[in-house]
Amino acid sequence: MSSPYETLQIETDGNVQLVRLNRPASGNSINLAMAEELNHWLWELYVDAGATRCIVLTGAGDRIFCGGGDMKERASMEPAAVRRQRALMERLIRQIADCPVPILAAVNGAAVGAGCEIVAAIDFAYASETARFSLPEVRRGISPGAGATQTIPRACGIRRAKEMILTGDMFSAAEARDWGLVNKVVPATTLLEETLAVARTIASNAPLAVRQAKKALDIATDADFGTGFRFELEAHAPTARSRDRQEAITAFAEKREPVFHGA
């Protein structure tokens, strides 16, 4: 299917949506147009995900996943546009966190600044062997503003997060894996297909159950055990009485794969 956006390339693969950040000539950096379009795309998913059960986010080309904010655009921005950009980035990170559909990243190259923060904000990520990561904000005279001080400690631990953010150093895909920022490092030639394969597995599961499990998991790092467990039980209840649950029971008895419909 053709994409309605200028800075995003969107394709469908069954119940999986593949989204490419599509500004390769500018390092897939996030300008105002891309920030607007990412927010619009996520809002549409929040309102009605339709047949989409899992998302894979990657960068166009084979060198850069996302180079962060568009510094060339920023240099000529009026104050009102700067404020608009900040508001859009805040909304973007919140919408990623609140998205009802799991989002996976296929990090196909450098993920710098906001690009690295997007990787930290989504559900989980695979990276190519050539991927690199950096949070260079302190080297550019600012502190992080797209969630890094909150998402990186949750993924990597507070001491590692301080090292990454306060030095602004570049680190490798293997280090990102060892520190918890990405789940797996794979050859560049197989990255997209391996990530899509995981997305297809998620998409084949009961959609309501996946959504409810994701909601419960998303509060696990913030809530105490008792609060989190109560939330899990509340999330579990509608799945236990769903038609998909009955379909799974029937399919098991009939020795076949279940066909889930999301209800």
Question: Can you say where each PLM-predicted feature lies in the sequence?
Answer:
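C-terminal alpha-helix plus adjacent terminal tail
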Residues: 1-17, 45-50, 62, 168-174, ...
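Conserved CoA-thioester-binding segment of acyl-CoA-metabolizing enzymes
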Residues: 1-58, 94
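Structured loop/turn residues at beta-strand edges in well-structured enzyme cores
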Residues: 3, 14, 50-52, 69, ...
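Phosphate-coordinating loops and pocket residues in cytosolic domains that bind phosphorylated ligands
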Residues: 29-32, 67, 76, 166, ...
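Short, conserved glycine- and acidic-residue-centered signature motifs
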Residues: 31-34, 85, 112, 145
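Hydrophobic alpha-helical membrane-association signature
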Residues: 34-38, 85-88, 118, 191, ...
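Glycine- (often His-adjacent) and acidic-residue-rich active-site loop
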Residues: 51, 59-95, 111, 141, ...
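Crotonase-fold acyl-CoA enzyme core
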Residues: 94-210, 237-242, 247-250, 254-256
